[in-house]
Amino acid sequence: MQWAEFQSPERGFAVSFPGTPKMTSVPVEGQNPLLQYDFQVSVGDNTVYSVTVFEYPAGKAPSRIDNDYYVRLVNAYAKGSEARLRKRGPVTVAGRSGFEAIADDGKGKLNHLVDIVPAGNRIYILATAGPRNHATGDDAERFRDSFRLLGEETQLQSAGTAPAPAQ
């Protein structure tokens, strides 16, 4: 597998993918004007790597992200992927406090690693799913550990405001 860093300055992140991601964007139903951006790479029949970015308008992101908020997000992920949460808890990703969960599909076939990283007006969800033991394997860790934010200037520009000039 050939891994390469993918950068999305518009969404404020970089991550290594094992291929070129397909990108889609949609408004989140019932949450207008919240937008969802998905970047996804599939490998073979049963392995996928994705970064989902929820982008809120300036000042509209959740102001208090606590354990309950994270639990609701990972429960929604598990429900959407027909998986059962096996392990969850706080984690540091890209130098930021976040949340991590491991889930299984109940058939013993797919294993998911999910990380949630809030940053400014965005919430990043890194998810990878693959065959048994994938969530604790080298490729899943490589994917998670390669994630980084591309700086506050990028976020300010994408929000429509230029950073203040240096004095």
Residue ranges with predicted function:
Residues 38-68, 125-127:
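A short acidic-to-branched-hydrophobic micro-motif
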